A protein has these predicted regions:
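Short pre-catalytic strand/loop immediately N-terminal to key active-site residues, enriched for Gly-Thr
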Residues: 114, 164-169, 221-226
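Small-residue helix-packing motif on alpha-helices
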Residues: 29, 39, 72, 195-202, ...
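Internal alpha-helical scaffold of NAD(P)-dependent oxidoreductase catalytic cores
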Residues: 103-113, 129-167, 178-216, 261
Length: 266
């Protein structure tokens, strides 16, 4: 049974640790965090183990690097000497935006096998969309072990590494865009007289159901939009207002801006 070590238990690291504990024995999962109390609290919740960075680097089969891109160099400088002494096989798993597999290897000081992933926050409830690319040193059997261990996080989609940044601008940043949309829908409902809690529930469930309809029907979103817009009806008037406000262009610009920010992080 593979052991998984998570260095960094913030929003994404913590979400993936939760997912791992759904799929493998929790005593095979190790957590480390700069604030030890945070790792300890999550470990108690998940009934897994607390460790430190060095211990995870020494022994975990899959080492999840759950830190921000800006401090990845410091982390890998810290654990690099430990990795260099290892005789057992291990795989680094990076989720840092903008940092390529080659850059992670460079910072770690060795041509180590790396899996680059781009998860999103819904992974915390098993509904994530996780993009991933395996470096050349990762065997197919190891990829399968990784996927089996992380199946509780949601959907996984392999992607050429050159497209990870583009994909992350949609699926990784997208939850924030959708949350903003849900909030705006709820605000509109409140403006029309709905209680806040009801407006938020209606908006969130509508987005959830609409997303599932796209996935399960296989229909183009435009066709599903057209099906709701009756001639001379209320929906088409709302759509017209969104179009006049530049809704599509604003969403596209948000994705492009998020994508371009990756280049500042490299």
């Amino acid at each position: 049974m593979a052991t998984l070590g998570f260095i960094g238990t913030g929003n994404m690291g913590g979400a993936l640790a939760r997912a791992a504990c759904k799929s493998i024995p929790s005593d095979q999962v190790f957590l480390a965090n700069r604030t030890v109390e945070k790792a300890r609290a999550l470990a108690e919740e998940l009934e897994c183990r607390v460790a430190d960075n060095e211990a995870i680097a020494e022994s975990a089969d899959f080492i999840f690097l759950g830190v921000k891109p800006q401090i990845m160099a410091d982390l890998l400088a810290e654990i690099g000497p430990v990795l260099a002494k290892r005789e057992s096989r291990f795989i680094l798993v990076t989720m840092a935006a903008g940092l390529t597999i080659a850059r992670i290897q460079e910072l770690a000081g060795g041509n180590y096998p790396v899996i680059r992933i781009m998860p999103n926050t819904p992974a915390a409830i098993g509904e994530g969309m996780i993009l991933y690319a395996c470096g050349v040193g990762v065997a197919k059997a190891e990829e399968n072990v990784f996927l089996d261990a992380m199946t509780g996080a949601g959907r996984f989609s392999p992607l050429p590494e050159k497209l990870i940044d583009a994909g992350s601008a949609v699926s990784g940043c997208g939850p924030a865009f959708v949350d903003l949309f849900i909030e705006a829908l709820a605000d509109g409902g409140v403006a029309c007289g709905l209680p806040r809690a009801a407006a938020q529930e209606y908006a969130a469930q509508m987005v959830l159901g609409s997303a599932r309809l796209v996935l399960e029907s296989g229909k183009h979103p435009g066709a599903l939009k057209d099906a709701v817009c009756s001639p001379g009806g209320t929906t088409i008037q709302g759509v017209r207002t969104l179009e006049e406000a530049g809704f599509r262009g604003a969403v596209m610009d948000a994705v492009i801006a998020a994508y371009e920010k990756n280049f500042d992080l490299k």
